Amino acid sequence: SCIKHGDFCDGDKDDCQCCRDNGFCSCSGIFGLKWNCRCDVGTT
């Protein structure tokens, strides 16, 4: 099952299994820590 745009995703994975082809996992973070990871879509 894919993750809808705006839903939480696993920040440890480059591919967040978004439903959109250009989807990726966008996280807030600092010093290697990640949080508030959600599926976002790129401009490509």
UniProtKB/Swiss-Prot annotation:
Keywords: Calcium channel impairing toxin, Disulfide bond, Ion channel impairing toxin, Knottin, Neurotoxin, Secreted, Toxin, Voltage-gated calcium channel impairing toxin. Its main location: secreted. InterPro entries: Omega-agatoxin_II/III_CS, Toxin_34. It is found in: Secreted. GO terms for molecular function: calcium channel regulator activity; toxin activity. Disulfide bonds join 2-19, 9-25, 18-39, 27-37. It comes from the Eukaryota. Expressed by the venom gland. Omega-agatoxins are antagonists of voltage-gated calcium channels (Cav). Toxic to mice by intracerebroventricular injection. The presence of a 'disulfide through disulfide knot' structurally defines this protein as a knottin. Belongs to the neurotoxin 04 (omega-agtx) family. 03 (type II/III omega-agtx) subfamily. This is U4-ctenitoxin-Co1a. It comes from Ctenus ornatus (Brazilian spider).
